[in-house]
């Protein structure tokens, strides 16, 4: 499925370089409606206030990590079905199991490239239609 330019995506990572790389990758795909947050707490506020189609969030962040954000999103009635891709620098099984139990739609191990991100997004968004 082609990704629509009108997709509204929230990128959550405490590292500006990762947010910038992810933004550039999304822009190469033609996606222009991109929000950013530095931590889970900030992201939760954005997700509640802004209509979104997808959250792409890092796991390790201060204040509220990606798993905490995922649980908060799944626990909030208005946004609980929002598609969620978790980014991690670790591909450990325990994290993957915890994320799956919390309701993650997909995960991606950093570093990643354009093709892998696109594939994960298409899988997640295609499953939502």
Describe each region flagged by the PLM.
Residues 16-35:
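Two-component/phosphorelay signaling modules centered on CheY-like receiver
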Residues 23, 68, 91-106:
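Alpha4 helix (beta4-alpha4-beta5 surface) of REC/receiver domains from two-component response regulators
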Residues 36-45, 66:
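Helix N-cap/capping motif at the beta->alpha junctions
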Residues 45, 67-80:
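Short amphipathic alpha-helix used as the core "switch/output" element in two-component signaling
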Residues 50-56:
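Active-site beta3 strand of CheY-like receiver
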Residues 58, 88:
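Active-site residues of response regulator receiver
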Residues 61:
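Receiver (REC) domain active-site loop signature in two-component systems and cognate sites
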Residues 94, 112-121:
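C-terminal output helix
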């Amino acid at each position: 499925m082609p990704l629509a330019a009108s997709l509204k995506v929230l990128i959550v990572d405490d590292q500006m370089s990762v947010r910038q790389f992810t933004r550039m990758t999304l822009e190469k795909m033609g996606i222009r409606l991109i929000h950013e947050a530095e931590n889970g707490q900030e992201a939760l506020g954005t997700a509640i206030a802004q209509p979104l189609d997808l959250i792409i969030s890092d796991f390790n962040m201060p204040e509220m990590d990606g798993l905490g954000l995922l649980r908060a999103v799944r626990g909030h009635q208005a946004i609980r079905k929002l598609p969620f891709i978790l980014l991690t620098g670790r591909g450990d099984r325990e994290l993957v199991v915890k994320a799956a139990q919390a309701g993650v739609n997909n995960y991606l191990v950093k570093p990643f490239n354009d093709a892998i991100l696109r594939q994960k997004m298409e899988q997640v968004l295609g499953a939502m239609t």
